[in-house]
Amino acid sequence: MASSYSSDLKLELQATGENASTWGDKTNNNLNLLQQAIAGYQSIDVASADVTLAMTDASVSNARNMILKFTGTLAGNRQVLVPNSIEKFYIVQDATTHNSNTLTFKTVSGSGFTLDQGTISAAFSDGTNITAVNLNTLSGTIGTAQIDDNAITTAKILDNNVTTAKIPNDAITTAK
């Protein structure tokens, strides 16, 4: 039975007993591909044309990188297209100059989102669409900050660093 390839990262899945003298090389290649998926970075110029990322079996591919930085001055509306059926998490940086144009990060056949110039976004592909991970989509609460008794001393506050303009009325109380 011949090797097959994983659906998302295209890692080689060796059949039992296959590659008797080369399994180490193939395993090392898979580990390098995992490293690319977890920590890979690539800068991609998107100024003059749409870019379709590739994910090929058992070889370094730009769609496998965790972090993608988009650069260039957009000459028109641009799209960065992730292959369909890839399920993966991305961090994308829009380091382009838009000049009234847009930059969209999406799958080839599905939907995605428009990047804002100068921002870094987290996003995931579910194999059909790409969704931005925004702070307003996360849940949980942030507790109220408290300062312990005797935590602030004169030695810790430089002269003129605390002014009434920096402290709203009634912001400091003895109640905890």
Residue ranges and their predicted role:
Residues 84-85, 117-121, 138:
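A short, sequence-level motif marking secondary-structure junctions
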Residues 70-72, 94, 107, 117, ...:
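Residues on the solvent-exposed faces and adjacent turns
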Residues 31-41, 99-107, 122-136, 164-166:
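Short, surface-exposed terminal/edge motifs of secreted or surface/virion proteins that either
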